[in-house]
């Protein structure tokens, strides 16, 4: 994780903090107390827990060590809302977070406001020395808040999908136009540079006197094309040898994936990894998550409610196992994360608008290639450290590195990913069976 020094930082950092926190609360305004408390599965967390945990992060890593006289809102929250930081202390079991009926939503909101009040106090009196000590923690805390905005949405959608009323809490989804036949971008291979540049590199120059988290006053905000923050797992920058390959020029659509289903793709073990086939059989998987078959027609649930499946929209909520099976059926494969980054680094992320009132892929908000801002794209690469990787010192070193086992990398960001996280070097990661994230398929092949 790196951050460039900023001048006169108190005002911009305070504004960035307030905007990030306000945006989280904007997402939950339509929700009831029950909506915020329930938990649909062990991998998901209640909305209320996300609201509290992000406050716990600022309280634990920023306020307690740096604001003299700070008093915790409730000492018991250190146990309730610690996620996985073993060096901080024990945690309440993740799979039982839905049992935390108290504190209620109003008390969690009071906790957030308590933390906000004291963060405002701290950020209003930043000295050069304090800024120097917080130049990693402040951007990390904001990035962490934004990551939980996306997780909050995916967890809420999974919860609502179980409800037979299929609640709608956002504007209707818009139909995609028919797509052209799949095309391919060829790449010759060779030695390529992968990873985020180190601070001070020519590609890392930044002269703005404000933080990299850029906000405006509207419900939507636009991507800042020069973010200064990088997670530690995006570094060090290093060379990788690529062999000639081609990358598909768009994502796989619902209609194309439905053809895989109609062809018996879920029943043909030759398409599947051994572990994927065992998962498919054990869980009785026969279509993507949130697809329903009614009256000989496919339907899909989203936070806009239940609607007829759009055959031209990109297929989403797909596991790595399903993505690999589909690619095998097509005679293709998934890209490695290095192939994806090499291709995507040549494309500027679109000046996309993130809108919390529309939480599904939208045809007008993406470039035709759908590299960024549409769906997270599975790669065949296992999540591993780059050569020379070193986690951050102290408890925040548990943020990324300790999860580099039994997970696969996704790239590109989704329609619900905050724009500060949209960049070629960003590495998301999940276990291969994960489906409740906004994940899709981009194929590759040897050239």
Q: Which residues does each predicted region cover?
A:
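Functional-site microenvironments in short loops/helix caps that host divalent-cation chemistry
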Residues: 141, 151, 155, 159-174, ...
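Disulfide-stabilized, aromatic/cysteine-rich ligand-recognition loop
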Residues: 1-45, 49-57, 61-122, 131, ...
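Generic detection of short hydrophobic beta-strand segments and adjacent strand-loop junctions
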Residues: 185-187, 213, 240
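Helix-capping and short linker residues that terminate individual alpha-solenoid repeat units
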Residues: 120-127, 348
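Short acidic, Pro/Gly- and aromatic-enriched capping/linker segments at domain boundaries
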Residues: 42, 179-180
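Secondary-structure boundary/capping signal
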Residues: 35-36, 127, 334, 351
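Long, compositionally biased low-complexity repeat segments characteristic
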Residues: 202-216
């Amino acid at each position: 994780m790196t951050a460039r020094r900023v001048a006169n930082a108190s005002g911009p950092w305070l504004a960035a903090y307030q905007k990030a926190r306000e945006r989280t609360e904007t997402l939950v305004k339509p929700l009831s107390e029950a909506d915020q408390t329930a938990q649909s599965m062990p991998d998901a967390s209640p909305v209320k827990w996300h609201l509290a945990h992000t406050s716990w992060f600022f309280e634990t890593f920023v306020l307690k060590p740096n604001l003299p006289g700070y008093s915790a809102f409730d000492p018991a929250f250190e146990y309730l809302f610690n996620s996985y930081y073993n060096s901080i202390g024990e945690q309440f079991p993740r799979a039982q977070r839905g049992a935390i009926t108290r504190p209620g939503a109003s008390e969690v909101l009071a906790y957030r406001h308590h933390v906000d009040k004291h963060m405002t106090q701290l950020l209003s009196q930043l000295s050069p020395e304090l800024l120097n000590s917080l130049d990693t923690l402040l951007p990390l805390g904001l990035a962490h808040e934004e990551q939980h905005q996306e997780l909050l949405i995916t967890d809420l959608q999974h919860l609502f999908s179980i409800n037979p009323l299929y609640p709608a809490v956002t504007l209707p989804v818009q139909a995609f136009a028919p797509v052209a036949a799949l095309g391919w971008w060829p790449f010759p291979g060779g030695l390529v540079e992968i990873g985020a540049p180190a601070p001070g590199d020519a590609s890392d120059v930044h002269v703005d006197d404000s933080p990299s988290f850029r906000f405006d006053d509207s419900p939507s905000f636009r991507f800042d094309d020069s973010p200064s923050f990088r997670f530690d797992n995006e570094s060090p920058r290093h060379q990788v040898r690529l062999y000639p390959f081609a990358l598909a020029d768009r994502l796989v659509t619902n209609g194309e994936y439905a053809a895989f289903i109609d062809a018996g793709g879920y029943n043909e073990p030759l398409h599947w990894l051994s572990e994927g086939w065992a998962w498919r059989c054990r869980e009785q998987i026969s279509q993507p998550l949130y697809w329903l078959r009614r009256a000989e027609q496919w339907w899909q649930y989203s936070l806009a409610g239940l609607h007829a499946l759009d055959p031209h929209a990109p297929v989403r909520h797909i596991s790595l196992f399903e993505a690999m099976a589909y690619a095998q059926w097509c005679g293709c494969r998934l890209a490695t994360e290095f192939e994806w980054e090499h291709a995507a680094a040549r494309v500027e992320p679109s000046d996309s608008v993130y809108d919390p009132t529309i939480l599904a892929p939208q045809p007008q908000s993406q470039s035709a290639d759908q590299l960024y801002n549409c769906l997270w794209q599975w790669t065949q690469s296992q999540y591993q450290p780059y050569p020379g990787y070193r986690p951050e010192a102290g408890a925040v070193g548990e943020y990324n590195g300790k999860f580099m086992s039994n997970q696969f990398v996704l790239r590109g960001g989704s329609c619900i990913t905050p724009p500060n996280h949209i960049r070629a070097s960003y590495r998301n990661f999940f276990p291969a069976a994960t489906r409740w994230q906004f994940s899709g398929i981009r194929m590759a092949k040897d050239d």
